[in-house]
Amino acid sequence: YMGDVKDAGIKHIFITTPTPDTVRLFQSLYDHGLNKPGFTFYAAEMILSDESPEVVYGSLGYFAPAAMLPSSEKLTLFKKVLEARLNKSIDTASSTFITSALSYDHIMAVAHAIRSIKNDSQIVNRENVMKYLRHMDFAGISGQVSLSPGSNDRAGMAVQIFNNQGYKADGKTVNFVSIGFVKTDTGTLIINDDAIIWPGASNF
C-alpha cells in the first residue's frame, strides 16, 4: 500500500485505522523511506510510548489528537495510585495514561447510570442504561462527564494535538509534545507552530 502511495507522489497522508494498523503503516513509511522533509502525517491514534525504533522513525513529526485532561485533585490522585500499582512513573502525555483516565470515567458513567436506575426503582436493562447515561453529569478524573444533548458525544471535552518528536532523553520513550488544542467554547484550533517538529527532521 505505501509503495503505491510513494509511486503516486502523495505527500500528505491521513491514517484513520486503529492503533495496531497505524503502527504497521508507520513501519511501512519507514521501510519505504517516506519520512522526509515535505511530507506530513496525520493519524487518529497515538502510538504507544515503547514502539520499535523503526515505527518511531517512520512516524517522526506526525500529528494525533487526544483528549485534554484538565488538572484536578482527582486526576493527580489517579496518577499517583496508577504509578503505585504499576511501580513506575507515568507520562501524563502518553496515550496509555489518557486512555486509562477516560476508560476509568467510562466505567464510572455506567456505574452512575445503574445506581440512578436502581434509585428510581427501575429495571436495569440496555434501554434504561442508555436512557440514564444521556442524563448523567458528574465530576470524573477526566473532567466533567456528560453527553451533548441528542448525541453520544462527550460534552465540553477539550481536544489537544500531539506531535511525535522522536525519543525523550532516556532514548527509549516516545516524546509526544502537545502543540495545539481546540477551544471548547468556539471550536477554534490554536497551534504553536514554533513547537512543531516535521517529518524528516535532522535533529531526531
Give residue ranges: language-model regions.
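Extracellular/periplasmic periplasmic-binding protein-like sensory domains
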Residues: 29-107, 114-128
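Segments of small-molecule ligand-sensing domains
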Residues: 82-191
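Extracellular/luminal ectodomains of metazoan preproproteins built from arrays
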Residues: 185-204
